[in-house]
Amino acid sequence: MRADESGPERESREPTHIPGAEPELGGEPTPRGEPGPGFEPGPGGEPAPSRAPFRSRLRKGVLAAVALGGVLGGSARYALGLTFPTPRGTFPVTTFAVNVSGAFLLALLLVYVLEIWPPTRYVRPFAAVGFLGSFTTFSTWMVDTDRLLGHGHYAVAAFNVFGSLFAGLAATGLGLAIGRMALARRVRLAARHGRARRYGWWVR
């Protein structure tokens, strides 16, 4: 053995590799047999079961809720269109009413879901994304506007565009106002009965 390959100098040049003890970025290697950072033991010190199956089931449940809400919302709008058809060349009252009422209901629902009701997994995907998302329609609104322009009803087409926008904004504001009034009332009742809680982000 050569002199330059023995002693502490050799150990400093060639550190012993321990399988399973690779260092993490910016940290020291974890000795083999010891839990690494972020390890959460389960009962009895055993590794906790993976949450991947639960997340997979939750994702499927959310998708199913969105799909079911979409079927019901689209069917409701289609039924309203058949019940209250719009004659060609006239103002599309049904589409206008559907979009404005949908804006109001969505604003009211989100206040209840985010500020009042306890946390849920499926109400928002089902009602907001699924039902109201398919109940309201941007494409039919634009198609109706194009048909009005095609028949030369320019004033009616302009009212359909701008009237829907402003009415939708007003309906959204009304839904938020009603929802927040209900939220403030619940806060007052809870405080009156000695059950004061912190409801919402704006009532503190």
Curated annotation (Swiss-Prot):
Q: What does this protein do?
A: Fluoride-specific ion channel. Important for reducing fluoride concentration in the cell, thus reducing its toxicity.
Which sites bind Na(+)? G133, T136
| CC terms in the record's Gene Ontology section | plasma membrane
Per its UniProt record, what InterPro entries does this chain match? FluC
What name is this protein filed under?
Answer: Fluoride-specific ion channel FluC 3
Entry annotated with the keyword Membrane: yes
Summary of activators and inhibitors of this protein: Na(+) is not transported, but it plays an essential structural role and its presence is essential for fluoride channel function.
Region Disordered, residue ranges: 1-53
Compartment annotation: Cell membrane
Q: Matching PANTHER family, A to Z?
A: FLUORIDE EXPORT PROTEIN 1-RELATED
Q: Where is the composition biased (Basic and acidic residues)?
A: 1-16
The coding gene here is: fluC3
Native source organism of the sequence: Streptomyces avermitilis (strain ATCC 31267 / DSM 46492 / JCM 5070 / NBRC 14893 / NCIMB 12804 / NRRL 8165 / MA-4680)
GO BP terms in the entry: cellular detoxification of fluoride
